[in-house]
Amino acid sequence: IIAGSNFIFSHINQNYPKYLDLKKKFLVIFRGINVDYFDPSITLETEENNLLSEWGVNRSKKLILLPGRLTTWKGQEVFIEALNLVNKELGHQSFYAIILGSDQGRDIYTKKIKRLAEQYRLTSQLKFVEHCQNMPLAYKLSDLVISASIEPEAFGRVAIEAQSMEKPIIASDIGGSNE
């Protein structure tokens, strides 16, 4: 049996102990990424400028990226609440933030988090981007990457992609993300 993280191993151990009792071989093999694809040295300045323009942001401010499907457990609401706190401390013009991901037809949730952004007057700083064909470039342009999941994930892929692109990551301390 192969688990993709220590979190998954612990979950199986706690919930399905018979598999361990049978003395079957059990391995933890962490999910990997293609480091040739997530290589910070591979981009063109024109691509960078085009993506920044598409997003409606420029290099004058720090860029915070939250990639992932738009769904309640991915923590976009927590992220927006945190951005509001940052604004209270640093002012409204200190950063841009991108929530990057599709709602996959869950437009009620998208409307909810957009209303929250409006409530906190974040609409000039916070952009919602549904798709990005070049995730390595999205990471490269970011100054900080966030994984704000409020429920445990099996493995924190966003974290290793960001780290491969040499970007700092702040991730929830639950599930496989903290590994």
Residue spans for each PLM region:
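A short helix/loop element that forms part of the nucleotide-sugar donor recognition site in Leloir-type
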Residues: 39-57, 113
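A short, active-site helix/loop in glycosyltransferases that binds the activated sugar's phosphate group
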Residues: 1-28, 33-38
